[in-house]
């Protein structure tokens, strides 16, 4: 199967059953390729296209035919030489034929005919009579339907359709893998962000305890406790929202992995083993990236194959404008035998070709009795509007597809530029978010020290705690977005499979 996946990326072969499903990103991708329904559905299309090639090739399969008939005739005759006047005859025939169409357009037939005839006519020299004939018939088109390319055009198109199906399959795999990566990092972010929100609750509760202690000793007004308790409740609500987001991302990932939600695996929580990394690589070369995308993109290669099909169809339709001019030829060998009967008035004589059925075949293949015929058949449809219209449609469809390809090329350039720009933007976001997070930590630390000596309020401390939690979440989001922007670039360049050393079987087929 051409679209079978070859996975050589390291990882666990199957999900390991523990209290949680501990999965690295490569584990998740391996499981997705193994179980994803969308990939399996697309794979069926490649199998269908492969069978369609066989269907088109079957046009050149030979046909073996065997025909057997028996008939009886009873006729009246007015001939003075017929005896008796009521003629009765019984005929049995058994014919074998073998015919085939060859790829240049040649059609041939080998035919072997055998007949036995028995009659009550007294003028039959052989009764019963055995007739044998071997015949070869040839038809060779010279204009319309002539040539390998014309007669194999449907096969060429079917093979291109298989390639198109493989491109669709590869595109689906890239799409599913990219979606899997994004969902995985969404889950990682939601889990890490939960820690941030929980830490924010801990800070608020710690401040609440400190405020309560100061209220009890009379250094703060009771209103400060209400402020602290209100903030704790607000942050606990954020934790609840974070839990909900985790569950959503868990379900999304299980759905991609095709894990039933009521199965033992589906009832467990997925625990990602990978953390998002901020690895600054060399700047993206737009020129090289565009060339890579044009070379690799399955949707672009699919359009090119479709264009090839249009050219093949146009060439075939152009051939159909030609008149039919066929050379026809036939060559036959024949022989007879049977039981010799005396025939003749007034002196009866015997037919010299008497003998058994086998003798009839011997005479046939001796080559002494033969026939041949040769000639041509010429046909020209007046007007020929159907063929002209089909050719015009082919040319219009080709021009339309060329414009579509040009438009896709522009789209690819735009997508590559956007993906490269997004990486650079997210890199700057991470750098800025890190600075902002560090400053928020310093601001909170300074404000807490002021609070300890009575130079700040709980409101200010809570506000700085909120700022720190927001900056920590922003930094996490920026790092995840940076990793997702690299996913997008790989998808746009169609290098996703190479990243995980995933090969299509069609990539290694001759």
Go through each PLM region and give its residues.
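Bacterial Sec-pathway N-terminal export signals of envelope proteins
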Residues: 1-91, 138-153, 157-159, 184, ...
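Acidic, low-complexity, intrinsically disordered peripheral segments
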Residues: 1, 12, 74, 253-264, ...
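Periplasmic alpha-helical coiled-coil/stalk elements that build and connect Gram-negative outer-membrane
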Residues: 166-289, 422, 426, 446-449, ...
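Sec/SRP-type N-terminal targeting helices
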Residues: 40-44, 48, 57, 103-131, ...
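Generic beta-strand/beta-sheet core signal
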Residues: 190, 204, 303, 310, ...
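Small/polar, glycine/serine/threonine/aspartate-rich low-complexity segments that form flexible
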Residues: 16-20, 68-136, 272-282, 315, ...
């Amino acid at each position: 199967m051409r679209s079978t996946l070859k996975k050589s990326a390291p990882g666990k072969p199957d999900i390991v059953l523990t209290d949680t499903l501990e999965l690295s990103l490569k584990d998740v991708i391996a499981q997705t390729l193994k179980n994803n329904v969308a990939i399996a559905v697309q794979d069926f299309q490649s199998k269908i296209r492969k069978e369609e090639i066989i269907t088109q090739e079957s046009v050149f399969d030979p046909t073996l035919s065997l025909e057997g008939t028996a008939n009886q005739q009873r006729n009246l005759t007015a001939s003075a030489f017929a005896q008796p006047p009521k003629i009765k005859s019984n005929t049995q025939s058994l014919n074998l034929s073998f015919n085939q169409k060859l790829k240049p357009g040649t059609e041939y037939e080998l035919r072997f005919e055998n007949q036995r005839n028995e009659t009550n006519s007294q003028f039959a020299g052989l009764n019963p009579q055995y007739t044998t004939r071997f015949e070869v018939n040839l038809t060779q088109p010279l204009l319309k339907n002539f040539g390998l390319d014309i007669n194999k055009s449907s096969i060429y198109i079917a093979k291109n359709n298989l390639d198109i199906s493989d491109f669709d399959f590869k595109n689906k795999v890239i799409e599913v893998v990219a979606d899997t990566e994004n969902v995985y990092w969404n889950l990682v972010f939601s889990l890490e962000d939960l820690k941030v929100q929980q830490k924010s609750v801990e800070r608020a509760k710690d401040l609440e305890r400190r405020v309560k202690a100061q209220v009890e000793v009379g250094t703060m007004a009771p209103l400060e406790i209400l402020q602290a308790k209100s903030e704790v409740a607000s942050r606990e609500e954020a934790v609840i929202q974070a839990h909900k987001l985790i569950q959503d991302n868990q379900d999304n990932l299980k759905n991609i992995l095709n894990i039933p939600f009521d199965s033992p695996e589906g009832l467990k929580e997925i625990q990602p083993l990978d953390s998002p990394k901020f690895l600054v690589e060399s700047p993206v070369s737009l020129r090289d990236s565009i060339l890579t995308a044009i070379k690799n993109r399955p949707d672009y290669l699919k359009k090119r194959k479709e264009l090839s099909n249009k050219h093949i169809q146009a060439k075939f339709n152009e051939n159909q404008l030609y008149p039919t001019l066929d050379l026809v030829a036939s060559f036959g060998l024949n022989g007879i035998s049977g039981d010799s009967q005396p025939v003749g008035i007034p002196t009866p004589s015997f037919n010299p070709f008497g003998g058994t059925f086998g003798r009839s075949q011997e005479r046939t293949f001796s080559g002494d009795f033969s026939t041949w015929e040769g000639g041509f058949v010429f046909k020209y449809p007046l007007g020929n509007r159907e063929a002209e219209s089909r050719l015009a449609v082919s040319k219009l469809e080709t021009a339309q597809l060329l414009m579509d390809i040009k438009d896709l090329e522009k789209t690819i350039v735009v997508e590559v530029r956007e993906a490269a720009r997004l990486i650079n933007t997210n890199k700057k976001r991470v750098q800025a978010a890190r600075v902002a997070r560090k400053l928020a930590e310093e601001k909170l630390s300074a404000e807490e020290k002021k609070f300890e000596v009575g130079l700040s309020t709980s409101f200010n401390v809570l506000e700085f705690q909120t700022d720190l939690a927001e900056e920590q979440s922003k930094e996490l989001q920026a790092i995840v977005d940076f990793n997702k922007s690299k996913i997008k670039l790989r998808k746009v360049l169609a290098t996703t499979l190479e990243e995980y050393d995933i090969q299509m079987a069609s990539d290694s087929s001759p």
